[in-house]
Amino acid sequence: MNETIELKTLDNHNFNAFISRPDSKPKGGLVVIQEIFGVNEHIREVCRKFMKEGYLTIAPSLFDREGKNIELDYTKNDISKGRILKEKYNLLSLNEIKSSVEYVKSAGKVGVVGYCWGGSLAYRSGCELTNINCSIAYYLSLIHI
């Protein structure tokens, strides 16, 4: 089953999250972290694919502090908007991720996977948050050695 739910962060911010629940007992929980485009059809499809593999999957909407359900296109203007939003909410986004981890941890072990900016957040989540058993960063950005 797929649906959008509302969660709350520890700093009392309400945000939406897309949930994909398998029909049978989940193998574990998975937090899917968006790119700079929001929780768009690509991210929802990623959630559905992991759900078909048996995982309780959640994608927090990290731009909800700016406005609900922000979805950007892959155009030059929207990429610019996404970069601005990324900079504005980069540090705060761990709050939404933490609440999402707490939501899916009842399914068992919890993984975090992120794409581009979300990959950077997945890396940070694995380093800074508790209750995460695995963190995967796909083509991450913002990590400097």
Predicted regions: what is each one?
Residues 5-105:
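Serine-hydrolase catalytic machinery in alpha/beta-hydrolase-like enzymes
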Residues 71, 143-145:
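Conserved small/polar residues in nucleotide/adenosyl-binding loops
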